[in-house]
Amino acid sequence: LAAVSVDCSEYPKPACTMEYRPLCGSDNKTYGNKCDFCNAVVESNGTLTLNHFGKC
């Protein structure tokens, strides 16, 4: 099973759109979209990873 990943190299961003495309993080939290998730990844110093696309 290949690990699912998201390219967060363009982040953090100061503001995210309201677009709803949920992702489930390794913290079992559902993030509203890639921007929200990637900002959290940056804040976690890379410890947060993607569990899967869609709600947790």
UniProtKB/Swiss-Prot annotation:
Q: Name one GO molecular function term.
A: serine-type endopeptidase inhibitor activity
- Residues glycosylated per entry: N45
Site residues, Reactive bond 3:
M18, E19
Matching entries from Gene3D superfamilies are given as: 3.30.60.30
Kazal-like domain segment(s): 6-56
Q: Name one GO cellular component term.
A: extracellular region
- Localized where? Secreted
The UniProt entry, under InterPro entries, shows: Bifunctional_prot_inhibitor, Kazal_dom, Kazal_dom_sf, Prot_inh_Kazal-m
Q: List residues traversing the bilayer.
A: none
Q: List the disulfide bonds.
A: C8-C38, C16-C35, C24-C56
The UniProt keywords, alphabetically, are: Disulfide bond, Glycoprotein, Protease inhibitor, Repeat, Secreted, Serine protease inhibitor
UniProt domain comment: Avian ovomucoid consists of three homologous, tandem Kazal family inhibitory domains.
* Protein name per UniProt: Ovomucoid
